[in-house]
């Protein structure tokens, strides 16, 4: 699944199959998050609404890795103390607090981000979402067609932390947020043929030695990641992830995967491409992420 369950006492996490969806019910700041947990955790299932009254952009909640978006909590809690349910959205990010290879796209038709469910201090759950972000029924998931390949660029955001084995083999001892640039190549029939996720940056608080304080986002020691498509349905491509070479921990292809879907409107078919992914690394980490990208016309 594209979610992680984390235990506070053992500082370990496991992949979970949690069905999650986000309905965007207005032009801005209007969401309904619906989660369906496995049977053993069914008490945590349900729907949570978010409005502008739930904005929680303080203390770094709206920054994942180096990308800054919007964050919401219900109920709105001081300092992010449980219990709460939280949501982030990066369809219209402010900025990338690092050396960005390209500007963060301002997405018109799709939203993407993370969700978090914190019932108490003993355990917590994080997952990812993507979906129509135009607040209108005119968005379609049709594949674009063209005479040549198309390139999409954007960013991945997500959560990463120690896996179920953890211990000394894990690079991290707790769940952290990350972001990374992503570039995807689509063929003339509108199918993903390749993709690359570059340097993963981890949010590590603020540098208060300067004024105003700046975000600290060191690189995670993980090699760049490739998308390897293996199948498709009418409107969704899927596949595995693998390491692209270079220095850093590698990704286990057998337990990693992605899905991607186009978003657009009549006259602008397939202008945006979004999806979700998960991966496991050789340095004891598991991660879930979502991404949003936009078509980049050839120069």
Where are these regions (language model features)?
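Mature soluble binding/inhibitory domains
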Residues: 1-299
């Amino acid at each position: 699944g594209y979610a992680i369950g984390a235990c506070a006492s053992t500082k370990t996490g496991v992949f979970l199959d949690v069905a999650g969806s986000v309905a965007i019910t207005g032009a801005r700041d209007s969401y309904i998050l619906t989660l369906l947990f496995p049977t053993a955790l069914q008490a945590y299932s349900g729907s949570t609404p978010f409005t502008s009254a739930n904005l929680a952009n303080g203390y770094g909640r709206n920054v994942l890795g180096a990308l800054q978006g919007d964050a919401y909590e219900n109920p709105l809690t001081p300092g992010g103390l449980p219990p709460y349910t939280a949501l982030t959205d990066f369809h219209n990010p402010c900025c990338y607090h690092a050396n960005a290879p390209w500007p963060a796209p301002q997405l018109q038709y799709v939203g993407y981000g993370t969700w978090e469910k914190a019932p108490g201090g003993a355990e917590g759950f994080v997952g990812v979402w993507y979906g129509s972000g135009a607040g209108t029924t005119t968005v379609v998931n049709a594949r674009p067609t063209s005479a040549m390949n198309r390139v999409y660029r954007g960013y991945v955001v997500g959560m990463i932390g120690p896996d179920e084995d953890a211990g000394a083999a894990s690079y991290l001892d707790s769940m952290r947020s990350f972001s990374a640039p992503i570039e995807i190549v689509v063929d003339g029939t509108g199918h993903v043929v390749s993709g690359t996720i570059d340097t993963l940056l981890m949010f590590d608080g603020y540098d208060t030695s300067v004024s105003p304080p700046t975000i600290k986002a060191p690189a995670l020691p993980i090699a760049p990641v490739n998308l390897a498509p293996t199948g498709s349905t009418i409107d969704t491509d899927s596949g595995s992830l693998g390491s692209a070479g270079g220095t850093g921990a590698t990704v286990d292809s057998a337990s990693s995967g992605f899905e991607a879907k186009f978003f657009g409107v009549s006259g602008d078919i397939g202008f945006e491409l979004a999806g979700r992914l998960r991966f496991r690394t050789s340095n004891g980490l598991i991660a879930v992420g979502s991404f949003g990208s936009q078509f980049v016309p050839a120069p």
